Amino acid sequence: MSKVNKICGVVDSRVDPYSHRAAKVESREFWRWGSDNRLPFLLSEISRCSTTHRRIINDKADYISGKGFTFDTEQQLLSEFVAQVNSSGETLRQLLNKVAFDKALLGNAFIEIVTDSDHTFLSLYHQDATRCRVAKDSEHILLHHNWNNFSSKDAVSLPLYPKFEPQADGTLRSIIHYKDYEPGFEHYGVPPYIAGLGVSAIAYKTDKWNISRLDNSFQPSGVMILDEAVDNEFDAERMVHNAEERFSGKPGQVMFIVKDGSEKDNSRFLPISASSDGDWEALHTQATNDIVVAHSWFRSLSGLDYSTGFNSERILHEYEVALNTVILGEQAELLEPLREVITAILGVDASSLEFVNRPPTRSKPIYMKVWEARRADGLDYDPEDERQQYYLSEISKYNVTKIG
């Protein structure tokens, strides 16, 4: 009977996006986005692996895209455009929510502008930033469905705004490229949280560690020595597979060793003990705190409580800080070129177009009137102004566009 020594440890099949190693890509047609031109896909994958990281990106996009818009209601054409900006039936708010999400996630976002030579219509379309690359002339954006297998004949080239170029369907098209400035990066923006990728990896791996413990039914890891004689490699493989299903809970948590059998069965399990639970929990807590800082964001605005719990005053205070340091600046960047496009193509004054921002929790009773709320906030108010006679309960649900 032959002697077979078999050691088996099953490796976790889940791909770790943080261990990505890029292969450099060169092209004469576009500027690569990352050394392998796949940085946006990597950032997208990372956002799907870290709960806190993803929650902050979602919340930033929601806050930046606001709760609606105020504008001059006498501009009927402007009102209709805000209600539907393209043939897909999207509102301006829905469009800008996608744009704000891309910009928060990737540091870049794109809006396609469609019109004709007579400016008889205007449509705006969000373009998935992962499909866009800056052309080598730095004056066009290339759109392609598969950057793993780029083909110039399948790519669509659009000029950067304010230039327009005619297309095969008779329309004139252009594209707006929003990007977060970063020294040394000319063609693409860099997301503000880039310095926090390391701590995002820690949060991801601590989550993965907890999942592994759960899959293993919280059994200790260790080495299982099976005292059994086998005739060939196939029998050894079968024995290890059966033992995995019986003992390991989750493949990869237990290493199996099959050794030559003897008259006495000396099979035994040798646990590998560790007392590092506290270290992992502290790492996860610190990583969560650092992710919030890297995003220039605030804990209470993303459902992350403090040791003292949630407090409405703290939420309102952090919202005010976020509004003045992050939200308003991002909103201004998004709206400025759109106001210009609307005015130039539709011929209406879009200067009155502004976001409506509301805190995540009410700070005033809903039975107050608008002029009373403005007085309480130290703003100009007029008790005789008809527009300020609405109760807060009314404008939180209806007629948002009528409040100046």
Predicted segment positions?
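Generic, well-ordered alpha-helical scaffold segments in large soluble proteins
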Residues: 242-246, 286, 290, 294, ...
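Surface-exposed loop-to-helix/strand elements on domain peripheries
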Residues: 218-231, 255-333, 347-363, 394-404
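A general alpha-helix detector
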Residues: 287, 322, 337, 369-372
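Helix N-cap / loop-to-helix initiation motif
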Residues: 296-298, 369, 380
